[in-house]
């Protein structure tokens, strides 16, 4: 018969053994063979702060959508089923992340809110208005607003928006005596009819921030407040299988070197939603088709892009991807892209197909029957290269491509006169005949100096008389970007704003011109 003392010792031994087994299996899950959590430790500054969790398995695959999240203290911090963490009060706790048989705990530390920290218009309200589409081009950000309420497109004009919300229409949108009855909140939360629908649920963090801003007297940001330097979407590049999910995170980096998770305030957009769509919480959902898509995240006039690649399934690709047998750098780039997308390059074009294409591309016409028979009969291994060089030395090449560039530059004879237009066209043909390097070609146009009767490059500067016109043309032709959208407001799909447009235009602001340049053909 076992005595009480021996029984107690035996029970303690069993408990110790069970604890050792549990911790060893747990350390196996938490170690190198377990889950990877981003961020590994969550630190929040006061209540109302939010962070998005990403979970990766041992293969580096995103499994956030397949995880179960649980807060050990829901009074301190709560977590959604998509891994979005929201602080309720200062304290410490842990969040449990479960994926199949793997379990991991994430430490959460919530500090007391800074005494000087407060909700301000530029720092907090504008991101909310942008995140929920209030200042989008399809809503109040359109040219004349919506239903009597206009905001600047994507919040590019803080002064205009602040006045529209707090003072316009006799200040009817804000009710400081009873902040929760403010029209701004009642419309956005759906308490009164709103054409845009319910945007801010009353139990949501965004609603609470707008309410606090109204209660505190609608403060604005000060000049010494931290500024957003840039944002980063994580991951910046991802390869996905069809019909899978990947969670993104958006980090904002500030002027003092600190960073903050702003996934919940970022606005997302996909370039090809059929291939890869993204929801408001930053979860990417791939479609059934292979291809590439760019996911854009926008926050406080800053942009970041995640490139999504969906390679062709091997079961659909009979031939394995092979590299192009070429030393040309363009072919090498194409080869890398083919391998990345799981594509096999097409076979080389037949000689007669190549002949037709190279004639049309270089001199803009088909080969004659005699030219075709002569070249097809050649047996030299480098006959394609020799043909291209011969075509590049022909006068038709210069005429054909000068005409293309004249279409791009589009000189107006009513601005510069017919003679100047002919001078420009002659200069373009000479550039192609002499094989002028492209950088020198661009330099001669941008830094043109001379008469439009003698210097063809100066016709472009003379024709586009205003700095903003030159900015539009030069940015399109030589930078490959469209800056004209940023002339009136921040570019809706690029990183460029009004400052970028007018800083660029300032380069052309001091160009001097002589002569009237009004009546054709006397300008010169």
Predicted regions and their residues:
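N-terminal secretory signal peptides that target proteins for export/translocation
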Residues: 1-11
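Bacterial N-terminal signal peptides
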Residues: 11-26
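Extracytoplasmic soluble-region selector
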Residues: 29-131, 140-147, 151-152, 159-162, ...
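Flanking scaffold residues of small Cys/His-coordinated metal-binding clusters
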Residues: 129-134, 480
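Short, structured secondary-structure elements
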Residues: 138, 151, 155, 160-166, ...
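Axial heme c-ligation environment in periplasmic c-type cytochrome domains
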Residues: 146-149, 180-209, 345, 408-418
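Acyl-group handling in specialized metabolite and lipid biosynthesis
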Residues: 168-171
């Amino acid at each position: 018969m076992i005595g009480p003392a021996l029984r107690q010792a035996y029970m303690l031994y069993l408990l110790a053994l069970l604890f050792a087994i549990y911790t060893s299996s747990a350390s196996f899950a938490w170690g190198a063979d377990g889950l990877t959590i981003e961020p590994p430790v969550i630190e929040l500054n006061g209540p109302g702060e939010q962070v998005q969790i990403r979970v990766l398995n041992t293969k580096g695959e995103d499994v956030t959508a397949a995880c179960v999240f649980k807060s050990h203290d829901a009074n301190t911090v709560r977590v959604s089923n998509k891994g979005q963490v929201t602080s309720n009060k200062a304290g410490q706790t842990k969040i449990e992340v479960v994926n199949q048989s793997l379990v991991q705990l994430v430490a959460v530390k919530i500090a007391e809110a800074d005494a000087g920290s407060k909700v301000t218009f530029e720092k907090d309200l504008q991101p909310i208005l942008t995140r929920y589409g209030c200042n989008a081009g399809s809503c109040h950000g359109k040219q004349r607003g919506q239903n009597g309420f206009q905001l600047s497109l994507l919040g590019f004009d803080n002064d205009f928006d602040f006045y529209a919300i707090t003072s316009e229409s006799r200040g009817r949108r804000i009710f400081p005596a009873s902040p929760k009855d403010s029209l701004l909140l009642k419309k956005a939360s759906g308490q009164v009819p709103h054409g845009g629908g319910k945007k801010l649920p009353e139990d949501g963090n965004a609603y609470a921030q707008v309410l606090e801003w109204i209660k505190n007297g609608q403060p604005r940001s000060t000049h010494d407040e931290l500024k957003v330097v840039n944002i980063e979407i994580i991951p910046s590049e991802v390869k996905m299988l069809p019909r899978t999910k990947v969670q993104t995170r958006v980090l904002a980096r500030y002027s003092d070197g600190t960073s903050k998770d702003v996934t919940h305030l970022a606005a997302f957009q996909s370039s090809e939603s059929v291939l890869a769509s993204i929801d408001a919480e930053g979860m990417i959902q791939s479609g059934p088709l292979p291809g590439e898509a760019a996911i854009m995240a926008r926050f406080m006039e800053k942009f970041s892009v995640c490139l999504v690649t969906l390679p062709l399934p091997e079961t659909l690709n009979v031939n394995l991807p092979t590299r192009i047998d070429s030393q040309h750098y363009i072919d090498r780039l194409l080869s890398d892209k083919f391998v990345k997308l799981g594509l096999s390059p097409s076979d080389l074009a037949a000689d007669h197909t190549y002949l037709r294409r190279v004639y049309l591309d270089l001199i803009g016409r088909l080969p004659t029957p005699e030219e075709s028979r002569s070249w097809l009969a050649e047996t030299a291994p480098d006959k394609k290269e020799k043909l291209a060089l011969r075509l590049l030395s022909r006068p038709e090449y210069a005429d054909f491509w000068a005409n293309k560039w004249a279409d791009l530059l589009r000189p107006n004879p009513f601005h510069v006169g017919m003679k100047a237009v002919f001078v420009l066209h002659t200069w373009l043909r000479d550039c192609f005949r002499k094989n002028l390097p492209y950088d020198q070609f661009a330099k001669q146009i941008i830094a043109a100096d001379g008469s439009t009767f003698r210097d063809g490059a100066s016709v472009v500067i003379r024709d586009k008389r205003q700095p903003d016109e030159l900015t539009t043309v030069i940015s399109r032709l030589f930078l490959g970007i469209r800056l004209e959208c940023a002339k009136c407001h921040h570019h809706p799909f690029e990183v460029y704003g009004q400052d970028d447009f007018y800083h660029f235009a300032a380069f052309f602001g001091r160009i001097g011109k002589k002569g009237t340049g009004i009546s054709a053909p006397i300008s010169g």
